[in-house]
């Protein structure tokens, strides 16, 4: 999946087990969908907490933040509870959506099932930006915000 591509609609359970559909999430504005390798690990915690801490900034650009990993619902629930996340964490337990986005790993799949990648998706399901960085955790939220601000001011 790259900038300009159209994302196929999908539905996955969030950390409460509630089914969440992309098209419904997009009804409130753009979605910043960030794939992370594993809940409760240091890098993923840093990344997800940075998204949490920028809640006001994302609200200003009318964008929703949505985390996604291959972790089961119960692990997502614990992650969300411990870190007090105010956004959905989707459970892509089979890796179907990760494969659709081209971020599912092959050989490294056991340790890190998905590539740390963020997609900024507009309300028409078009990809506005793709942010890839395995090591710069803050870059994902920061660059997504920069993209959304540029579009709003443009």
From Swiss-Prot:
GO terms for cellular component: cytoplasm. It catalyses: a hydroperoxide + [thioredoxin]-dithiol = an alcohol + [thioredoxin]-disulfide + H2O. Residues 1-153 form the Thioredoxin domain. The active site is at residue 44. One of its GO terms (biological process) is cell redox homeostasis. Disulfide bonds join 44-49. It is an enzyme of class 1 (oxidoreductase). Its EC number is 1.11.1.24. The active site is a conserved redox-active cysteine residue, the peroxidatic cysteine (C(P)), which makes the nucleophilic attack on the peroxide substrate. The peroxide oxidizes the C(P)-SH to cysteine sulfenic acid (C(P)-SOH), which then reacts with another cysteine residue, the resolving cysteine (C(R)), to form a disulfide bridge. The disulfide is subsequently reduced by an appropriate electron donor to complete the catalytic cycle. In this atypical 2-Cys peroxiredoxin, C(R) is present in the same subunit to form an intramolecular disulfide. Belongs to the peroxiredoxin family. BCP/PrxQ subfamily. Thiol-specific peroxidase that catalyzes the reduction of hydrogen peroxide and organic hydroperoxides to water and alcohols, respectively. Plays a role in cell protection against oxidative stress by detoxifying peroxides and as sensor of hydrogen peroxide-mediated signaling events. This is Putative peroxiredoxin Rv1608c. The gene is bcpB.
């Amino acid at each position: 999946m790259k900038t300009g591509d159209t994302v196929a609609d999908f539905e996955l359970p969030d950390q409460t087990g509630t089914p969440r559909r992309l098209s419904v999430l997009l009804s409130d504005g753009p979605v910043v969908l960030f794939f992370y390798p594993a809940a409760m690990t240091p890098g993923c915690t840093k990344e997800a907490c940075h998204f949490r801490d920028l809640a006001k900034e994302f609200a200003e650009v009318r964008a929703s933040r949505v985390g996604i990993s291959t972790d089961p619902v119960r692990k997502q629930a614990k992650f969300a509870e411990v870190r007090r996340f105010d956004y959905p964490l989707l459970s892509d337990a089979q890796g179907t959506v990760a494969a659709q986005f081209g971020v599912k790993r092959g050989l490294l799949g056991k340790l890190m099932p998905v590539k740390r990648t963020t997609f900024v998706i507009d309300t028409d399901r078009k990809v506005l930006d793709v942010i890839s960085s395995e090591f710069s955790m803050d870059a994902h939220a920061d660059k997504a915000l920069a993209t959304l601000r540029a579009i709003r001011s443009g």
